[in-house]
């Protein structure tokens, strides 16, 4: 849990800027959260928010549930998109380039491994792909534990290399089915409420997707977060859960992307509730389950652009807002310094 001893001072500093109280809306909340995070363990509150080496980690993994026809694309597309990330051709590459965000791509277990000597690629494979959770557990509990550990360690290394704001993205054909099943099982919501169109499936595919999610969650008798990950999770989701826990352990904010990343964020809060304090929600996804997650996490997203791509695109697009929040906190004049009387 965040130490709030400097909260009042930080809010006073924001309120004394040359503007009406609250006039910068969500920017003020973001600035307050960032300043409070960066004041943890310090003798005084920070006067200057630092944003160093922002980085997005894209976790890629394949899903056995893809065999059930729950996506418009085959599993081979996961590998193809990883190659696209590495060559700089994806949407996330464009948005990171324009916003000065570095990219790491993690193979958590894709069907067709990528042969590349790119510095962007890290292999943390938990398997070839998950099992088909319509019929059996997606992975063992031991694999869940190992995946969380790998995600935590990767984020800790990233932070030790100078990054102090981090984002997660994901890629994996079938992963909206996994995320929907996790949400349904842990939040006690129906599959119909949690399942969305994903990559743009038709009504027949949507009905099939709901049916297989119901099959998977029928085995989720134990509401324990790790048990649910074992039954219906994905390798990339498990490692993102670990990533959120790693950011919490290192007192580092995470700019949270859309539906699938938010599912991982939710699971992380069930394991360690205090990690919620380090999350800033980038955008509101078009996926139906994301509204449920934002309510569960009491989150007010920065953007609402109708996005449903994934990859971390919403987080990268929100980075200029984060920079603007830091800039006004750091450099906007106070009434006293500007000689403005009100």
Curated annotation (Swiss-Prot):
The keyword Cytoplasm does not apply. One of its GO terms (biological process) is cobalamin biosynthetic process. Its EC number is 2.4.2.21. Pathway: Nucleoside biosynthesis; alpha-ribazole biosynthesis; alpha-ribazole from 5,6-dimethylbenzimidazole: step 1/2. It catalyses: 5,6-dimethylbenzimidazole + nicotinate beta-D-ribonucleotide = alpha-ribazole 5'-phosphate + nicotinate + H(+). The active site is at 311 (proton acceptor). Pfam families: DBI_PRT. Gene3D superfamilies: 1.10.1610.10, 3.40.50.10210. It comes from the Bacteria. Keywords: Cobalamin biosynthesis, Glycosyltransferase, Transferase. One of its GO terms (molecular function) is nicotinate-nucleotide-dimethylbenzimidazole phosphoribosyltransferase activity. PANTHER family: NICOTINATE-NUCLEOTIDE--DIMETHYLBENZIMIDAZOLE PHOSPHORIBOSYLTRANSFERASE. NCBIfam families: cobT_DBIPRT (TIGR03160), PRK00105.1 (NF000996). Catalyzes the synthesis of alpha-ribazole-5'-phosphate from nicotinate mononucleotide (NAMN) and 5,6-dimethylbenzimidazole (DMB). Belongs to the CobT family. This is Nicotinate-nucleotide--dimethylbenzimidazole phosphoribosyltransferase. The gene is cobT.
